[in-house]
């Protein structure tokens, strides 16, 4: 929209006529509902465009909550009890990091991330996240890596971890010591963590393909249909990682309504603001809405509701839209008096709104991500959304509760130490019953853990909530209850007997091995061929017709080669995962299939085949994450070595074997003869199934 057109919109030439239109829409909403109003508005927009009007499309909405107060689902929980539990978890999460950094060596750790997201996790644990049980397959939660201390603190109150365990945060090399890793690592805690989410960006892309694979298993009849969800927690700064947003169109295109992203928008990353000169929530709303996601903005807490209700002229909403994130951060860092002057003071109307509020009242105007009632309403809406994935953009304060030690400060992410005065302020703010004499000093024991006792109302409430939801989380299944038969070496006789005078590549030999497995009635349903738009290069096009390409909505067109034997066949129950030109997508699908034995109690046998030069070199971090979570499957680096010399320097692959060798639980082979590929296949299946 050009400046002249924008000015025309902003300066209404006929407010009375505009009011009549607004009243008409209000009448439609009252009589026939919002869907009918939306239909009428879309028709009006279409007519205007057909008449030549230029109406730019906007994927963003006002800087207010998506769910109005009157439509919020009400939480069934005991709000006072849940606040008390949340305070205890906050204290112990802080204590374990501060204690770790009062030891020699300053072990590191993070306080501020969980401090900002405690309510987001608490509501999920208390009301939404189901553990695997006889009645339900369980939800999959991808926890934000830097929030791990808060997850450990909850497990401590539940009795799953001891004070000794907490005191060994980041201490994992001492003999006989359990130790707690700094981030979610299934390799280090195989019965606890499920998905490694650090390095940043790994959680979101894995969550998308885990959700896709759950739908895949259901479509192929391998598991019963259910309402299980994949929840992924990530930070707003983390969204700059290509893996964070690079696959969100997959989720929108495949209508993955079993997927929920919760983005903790505390407006800060490691060094400073995420978008100090802009608005990260608006930016992310546009990106996700454009990719076909249901976007729920959770910006303001309940204390803002009366002010917004009085904003009949829209001046407060206008101010909210104008204010950039750097200013919002300053408001929380400098307090109520600063906010009165520099935020509300920009317009006479907004200044008048808070004239009767004290500076303390203004400081207490809360953000949506810290309001359990608003969080519950957002989660409730997310789990009841059909036909599309949901992202919740929750605005929070980084370092919430840390005060001068880090609350809304640029140094919050690096804050690992809190001195005596800051610890006392934290204790008082969250009403922890620890006397002054126990927190005087700067030694280790001056920041004690607090547990109210296993029979306390708080612990009993926590355990009752988790019992109703199937059990404690995090929890990881280490071994599937199902077993698959392992074929003998004779199954691969067509490969082991050789090809006579005719030479074939080892890539072709491997593909033949896959085809032999697809003819085995017991193993075939569990084989998952995964390609990234190179099936024809590797001689796999025969699988298109034989087992079909997975397409959630089926094939809605007649393929160009439909009259040929090996035509391009897509089907709702197709077996091949065709991930397009995306090695990161292909390996994430492979990870989902290779962890199915643990996540879904359904062992599978995935084969991800790719140009060797674009494997470990390009997606090494995801492959390392695969090793971390004990993926079972085959990675096939095809057309390797000198095969690509003619393609240019970037394609020359002489290092993949070297890189593969540094992943400890990746058994790397470079076969020369066909019979070697048969042995590798048979022995690999024996090892993994």
Region locations from a protein language model:
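Cofactor-binding active-site loop characterized by glycine-rich and histidine/acidic residues
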Residues: 71-72, 77-89, 93-103, 110-254, ...
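Active-site phosphate/pyrophosphate-binding segments
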Residues: 488, 628-689
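Short acidic, glycine/serine/threonine-rich loops at helix termini
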Residues: 152-156, 181, 218, 222, ...
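N-terminal amphipathic, basic-rich helices that act as targeting or association modules
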Residues: 2-158, 162, 426, 503-520, ...
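Acidic, glycine-rich active-site loops and adjacent beta-strand->loop/helix elements
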Residues: 145-149, 231-241, 264-269, 301-304, ...
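Long, well-ordered, tryptophan-enriched scaffold segments
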Residues: 265-497
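Non-catalytic terminal/interface segments that mediate subunit docking, oligomerization
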Residues: 72-93, 114, 129-132, 139-140, ...
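A glycine-rich helix N-cap at a beta->alpha junction
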Residues: 160-172, 252-264, 286-293, 624-641
């Amino acid at each position: 929209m050009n400046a002249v057109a924008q000015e025309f919109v902003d300066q209404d030439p006929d407010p009375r006529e505009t009011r009549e239109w607004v009243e008409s829409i209000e009448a439609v909403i009252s009589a026939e509902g919002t869907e009918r109003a939306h239909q009428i508005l879309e028709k009006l927009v279409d007519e205007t465009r057909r008449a030549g009007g230029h109406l730019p499309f906007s994927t963003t909405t006002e800087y207010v909550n998506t769910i109005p107060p009157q439509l919020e689902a009400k939480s069934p929980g005991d709000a006072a009890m849940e606040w008390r539990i949340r305070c205890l978890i906050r204290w112990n999460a802080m204590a374990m990091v501060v204690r770790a950094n009062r030891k020699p060596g300053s072990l590191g750790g993070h306080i501020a991330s969980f401090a900002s997201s405690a309510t987001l996790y608490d509501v999920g644990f208390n009301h939404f996240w189901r553990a695997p049980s006889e009645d339900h397959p369980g939800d999959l939660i991808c926890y934000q890596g830097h929030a791990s201390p808060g997850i450990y603190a909850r497990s401590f109150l539940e009795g799953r971890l001891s004070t000794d365990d907490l005191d060994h945060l980041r201490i994992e090399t001492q003999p006989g010591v359990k130790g707690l890793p700094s981030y979610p690592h299934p390799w280090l805690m195989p019965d606890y963590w499920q998905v490694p989410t650090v390095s940043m960006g790994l959680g979101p892309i894995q969550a998308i393909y885990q959700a896709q694979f759950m739908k895949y298993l259901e479509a192929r009849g391998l598991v019963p249909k259910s309402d299980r969800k994949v929840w992924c927690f990530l930070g707003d700064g983390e969204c700059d990682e290509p893996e964070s947003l690079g696959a969100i169109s997959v989720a929108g295109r495949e209508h993955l309504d079993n997927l929920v992203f919760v983005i903790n928008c505390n407006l800060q990353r490691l060094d400073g603001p995420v978008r100090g000169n802009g608005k990260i929530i608006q930016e992310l709303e546009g990106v996700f809405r454009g990719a076909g996601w249901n976007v729920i903005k959770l910006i303001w807490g309940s204390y803002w509701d009366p002010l917004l209700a009085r904003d009949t002229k829209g001046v407060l909403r206008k101010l909210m839209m104008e204010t950039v994130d750097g200013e919002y951060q300053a408001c929380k860092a400098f307090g109520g008096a600063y906010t009165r002057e520099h935020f509300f003071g920009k317009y006479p109307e907004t200044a008048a709104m808070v004239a009767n509020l004290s500076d303390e009242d203004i400081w207490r105007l809360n953000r949506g991500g810290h309001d359990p009632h608003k969080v519950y309403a957002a989660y409730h809406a997310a789990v009841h959304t059909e036909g599309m994935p949901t992202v919740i953009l929750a605005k929070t304060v980084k370092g919430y509760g840390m005060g001068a030690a880090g609350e809304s400060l640029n140094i919050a992410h690096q804050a690992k130490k809190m001195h005596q005065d800051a610890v006392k302020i934290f204790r008082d703010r969250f009403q922890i019953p620890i006397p002054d004499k126990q927190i005087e000093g700067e030694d280790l024991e001056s920041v004690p853990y607090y547990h109210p006792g296993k029979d306390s109302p708080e612990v009993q409430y926590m355990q009752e909530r988790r019992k109703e939801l199937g059990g404690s989380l995090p929890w990881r299944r280490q071994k599937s209850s199902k077993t698959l038969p392992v074929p003998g070496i004779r199954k691969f006789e067509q490969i082991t007997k050789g090809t006579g005078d005719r030479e074939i590549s080892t890539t072709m030999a491997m593909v033949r091995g896959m085809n032999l497995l697809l003819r085995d009635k017991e193993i075939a349903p569990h084989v998952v061929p995964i390609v990234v738009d190179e099936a024809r290069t590797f001689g796999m096009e025969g699988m298109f017709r034989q087992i079909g390409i997975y397409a959630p909505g089926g094939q809605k067109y007649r393929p160009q080669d439909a009259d040929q034997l090996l035509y391009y066949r897509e089907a709702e129950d197709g077996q091949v995962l065709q991930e397009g030109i995306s090695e990161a997508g292909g390996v994430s699908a492979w990870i989902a299939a290779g962890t199915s034995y643990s996540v879904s109690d359904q062992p599978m046998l995935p084969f991800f085949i790719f140009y060797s030069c674009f494997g470990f070199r390009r997606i090494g971090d995801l492959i390392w994450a695969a090793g971390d979570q004990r993926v079972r499957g085959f990675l096939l680096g095809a057309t390797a070595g000198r095969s690509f010399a003619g393609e240019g320097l970037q394609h020359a692959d002489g290092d993949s074997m070297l890189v593969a060798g540094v992943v400890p639980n990746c058994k790397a082979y470079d076969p020369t003869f066909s019979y070697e590929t048969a042995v590798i296949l048979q022995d690999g299946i024996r090892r993994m199934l």
